[in-house]
């Protein structure tokens, strides 16, 4: 059965080896709606076990989609900030833009990664951003991304909306800095999906 979803949504997945459903962001946007891709990083006991327990062709129960990240907000510029595996909702929006046409305003994607594995995912991110008309900025997470970096690249535009998916402490720090540049909390869209 096709799963109708919009970029940025998540589903609950139940695997054969575990009766409990767990939430994961959908990291794809296929026009045929017959395929889904999830990016799952080993962050806890359950996600660590998946690499060992999952087998190709295994049945998985998919519930949802749930959640809503609205990327269709009018602004002079959009800024997307992803911390590590927080890139997943942006991947689905990039695929949507690639298939439906370029964005209506400039978009900057700031991808903050620290570990070597994160630098490799997704392998086609540069190409995907180019095809979607989005400017990619890769930042080593050990170097702190600050509001001043974002605002310099945004030509200090006042009508900027920011979408964030990553650690809560990073979100709080970034929002505090952006508010000093006149970016309101209403213009800061934070994916608070932090269940594991």
Language-model region placement:
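Phosphate- and divalent-cation-binding pockets in alpha/beta enzyme and binding domains
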Residues: 49, 70, 89-92, 173-174
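Ferredoxin-reductase
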Residues: 1-61, 113-115, 126
């Amino acid at each position: 059965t096709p799963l109708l979803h919009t970029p940025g949504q998540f589903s609950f997945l139940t695997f054969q080896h575990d009766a409990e459903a767990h939430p994961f962001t959908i990291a794809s946007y296929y026009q045929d709606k017959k395929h889904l891709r999830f990016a799952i990083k080993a962050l806890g006991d359950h996600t660590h076990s998946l690499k060992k327990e999952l087998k190709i062709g295994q049945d998985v129960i998919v519930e949802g989609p749930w959640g809503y990240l609205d990327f269709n907000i009018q602004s002079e510029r959009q800024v997307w900030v992803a911390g590590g595996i927080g890139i997943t909702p942006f991947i689905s929006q990039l695929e949507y833009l690639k298939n439906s046409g370029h964005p209506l305003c400039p978009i900057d994607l700031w991808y903050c990664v620290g570990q070597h594995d994160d630098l490799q995912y997704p392998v086609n991110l540069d190409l995907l951003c180019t095809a979607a008309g989005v400017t990619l900025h890769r930042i080593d997470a050990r170097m702190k991304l600050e509001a001043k970096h974002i605002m310099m690249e945004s030509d200090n535009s006042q009508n900027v909306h920011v979408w964030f998916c990553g650690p809560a402490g990073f979100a709080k720090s970034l929002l505090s800095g952006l508010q000093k540049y006149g970016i309101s909390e209403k213009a800061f869209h934070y994916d608070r999906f932090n269940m594991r």
